[in-house]
């Protein structure tokens, strides 16, 4: 993730397999609820420093009061951990003893644009091209966490791979009372983003290799005026620096053949000109605290869903189908 220009602070940035659904449920009950249920679940453990080597790589920089998509990778001994059974605990840390307020499973979503360690790049004509080696980020863990007030919270992540021991990682986060980026249910900014017809060279507004003209045909404001749903991806493909940034533009591209006749797919670069110098006007209008982001905007111009950081086709397609009223 590139650094913000001077004066603009930037935050840091299918079900997991086991030996059956019963073991997954048993693990969740054991590590999330503890022997005494949600009210008593070893809240004191959250006050102890983590002593193991499990390191979370959080891709969600903005948490707000309400429900949140909390996405993260897990690093162990220098490698990203895939397909583990994972749960997340949320603690109120305002008192001397942290109080457990919620416990949720985290589902591992495998990236559909990674095959055998190589990055699958979708060209505008529909052909597939393998680039290698890909990042070792082949998927992402997602938990949906509730925060009922603004301020500090404690997060405990518990992970178990196969029959191995339960490993933990702990961190503190802050829930905002008011979001910076637009929330679902609010009107989308009526941005007049640059499109292909505005530039002599498409690479001026798309750092993908090669640039994809399908993602630069429609202005956000025009789609709203026409009552056309949108999938808008804010990303800088060439300069994705974070280990878990992921090929989000390629994930979006995979949906165009199926939904392109009903949905406007739009890509907006983060920077106007050289990276790190100035944000594009559309990015400033959307007040994004990080990148990448994907927003779904319905035919009324309301935001239906938002995804920060690494996102999989399965998550995105489910949201698109819901927006279109499809089963």
Regions found by a protein language model. Name each.
Residues 1-18:
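N-terminal secretory signal peptides that target proteins for export/translocation
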Residues 20-34:
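Bacterial N-terminal signal peptides
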Residues 44-205:
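Contiguous segments within soluble domain cores/interaction surfaces
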Residues 181, 304, 308-327:
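Thiol-/selenol-based redox modules, centered on thioredoxin-like
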Residues 201, 212, 220-240:
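Short active-site neighborhood of thiol/selenol oxidoreductases, capturing the structured segment around
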Residues 234, 260-276:
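Thiol-based oxidoreductase modules, predominantly thioredoxin-like and allied folds used
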Residues 242-259:
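Typically the conserved alpha-helix immediately C-terminal to a functionally engaged Cys/Sec
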Residues 269-291, 296-300, 322:
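Thioredoxin-like thiol-disulfide oxidoreductase module
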């Amino acid at each position: 993730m590139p650094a913000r220009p001077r004066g603009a602070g930037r935050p840091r940035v299918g079900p997991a397999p086991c030996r059956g659904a019963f073991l997954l449920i048993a693990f969740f009950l054991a590590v999330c609820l503890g022997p005494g249920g949600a009210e008593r679940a070893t809240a004191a453990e959250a006050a102890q420093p983590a002593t193991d080597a499990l390191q979370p790589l959080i891709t969600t920089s903005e948490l707000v009061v309400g429900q949140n998509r909390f996405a993260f990778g897990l690093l162990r001994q220098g490698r990203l951990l895939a397909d583990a059974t994972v749960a997340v605990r949320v603690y109120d840390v305002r008192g001397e003893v942290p109080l457990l307020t919620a416990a949720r499973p985290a589902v591992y979503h495998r990236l559909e644009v990674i095959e055998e360690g190589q990055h699958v790049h979708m060209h505008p004509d529909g052909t597939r091209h393998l680039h290698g080696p890909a990042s070792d980020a082949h998927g992402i863990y997602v938990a949906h966490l509730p925060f009922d007030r603004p301020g500090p919270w404690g997060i405990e992540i518990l992970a178990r791979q196969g029959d191995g021991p339960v490993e933990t990682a702990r961190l503190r986060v802050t829930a905002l009372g008011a979001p910076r980026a637009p929330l679902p249910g609010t009107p989308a900014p009526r941005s007049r983003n640059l499109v292909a017809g505005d530039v002599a060279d498409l690479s001026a507004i798309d750092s993908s290799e090669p640039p994809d003209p399908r993602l630069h045909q429609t202005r956000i404001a025009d789609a709203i005026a026409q009552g056309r749903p949108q999938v808008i991806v804010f990303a800088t493909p060439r300069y994705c620096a974070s280990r878990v940034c992921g090929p989000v533009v390629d994930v979006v591209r995979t949906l165009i053949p199926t939904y392109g006749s009903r949905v406007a797919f739009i890509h907006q670069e983060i920077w106007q000109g050289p990276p790190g110098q100035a944000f594009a006007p559309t990015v400033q209008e959307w007040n994004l605290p990080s990148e990448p982001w994907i927003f779904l905007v319905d035919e009324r111009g309301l935001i239906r869903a938002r995804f920060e950081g690494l996102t999989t086709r399965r998550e995105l397609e489910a949201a698109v189908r819901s927006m279109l009223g499809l089963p």
